[in-house]
Amino acid sequence: MATSSQPVAQPATKSIVGQLSLLDRFLPLWIFLAMAIGVGLGAIAPGIKGVFNTLSIGTVSLPIAIGLLWMMYPVLAKVRYEELGKIGDAKRQFSVSLFLNWLIGPAVMFALAWIFLANEPGFRTGLIITGLARCIAMVLIWNMLAGGDSEYCAVLVALNSVFQIILYSPLAYFYLMVVPSWLGLEGTTVDITMWDIAKSVLIFLGIPLAAGIITRFYFLRRKGREWYETELMPRLGPTAMIGLLFTIVVMFSMQGDRILAQPLDVLKVAVPLLFYFVLMFFLSFGLAFVSKFGYKMSATQSFTAASNNFELAIAVAVATFGIVSDEAFATVIGPLIEVPVLIGLVYVSLWLSRVAFGRREAMPEVA
């Protein structure tokens, strides 16, 4: 595993945006298009809600369940679970990361949700469950663009995947029901139990996690790492976008009237998310810097803590609160804001590498 004593990777000479794949580069655009298609579909065919609800798994229609499961599966098949054995190589760094991801991150999102959305319980809850979903996908891209520690990031992603199964449900119940009661705040207006959340996590994270692990270890053994990384994942990985966009189309087709009547709802959710990404990035970078982790490790710590697993947040919100809920709506705004903000923070990270760590290489072009 790379450590802080190793040389910092040379920054890319190609523009940061140019290094992203077409799908990742225009993710906000694809999401906006999916929203628009969904709203249009709902207006043209108002009976579509009944079609989607004809078959269901619990409270989730079968088509939506398939979309939710599929958008998680390729992401989890990409995680390097075999790297978990390297945790002992950087115990201090992993301890700091777990502290940032599972204690500070959820608490910061909880605070921002209540500050900005005190009178919007649905949106507030959606933000809180988004803050609990630690990033396991896009962080690999941000880390690579910023010249972070790729090995450490891979292990951390695998660790967060496992921790989400264990910690997501109790932490969600804690921040939605217990903490508001302690602080004398109004609790969520939806009557939920820890089992309601756990059931959603077990289905929509547990199933694709198991499938991803089986897929990875089976094909690594049968075909080898090179085939898996260069042949299978380039084909399988992008299909996660199909599941995500399909889910968004259906969500917005079922609440198009509400969206047209209240277009500023997107802005209500976007503002605290923007604060969250920026706060977590600088807080994490500052902590890593004073801990003398070096640039590569500091960048990885920062992007891991500042990013979120919006696929899991969407799945939990839809399964627990319903596809037309404010909670589900709020989780969809996450990737809209995260992608452009994190691209900007990559530039900030590279600038900090020069200012705080003495890098003299030229910055990448902006476009």
Language-model features: locations:
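Alpha-helical transmembrane segments of multi-pass small-molecule/ion transporters
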Residues: 1-78, 82-306, 310-367
